Amino acid sequence: MDPQHPVVFLQGPVQSPYVPWEEGLTLTRAIATAVYTGFMNPMVIRVFRHGQIVGDFKGIDLLKHEDMALEAGDMVVIIE
């Protein structure tokens, strides 16, 4: 991964823990790009920005809300 290219970090059952950030990157697109590999639907998805939780979703509820825009350096934690 190019250290000069901004990224979003994903922790949990994904193939790629880094997704290149670009303007307009959303939470669901980042998870799809990272390739979710879990056996179950995620129970909780949390988005951290500068160490603070800025998004906290129950996995299935994620589809019921407007897709969250991510910023460079965000960390997405997926809990099964």
What kind of region is each of these model predictions?
Residues 1-80:
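Ser/Thr/Pro/Gly-biased, low-complexity, turn-/loop-rich segments
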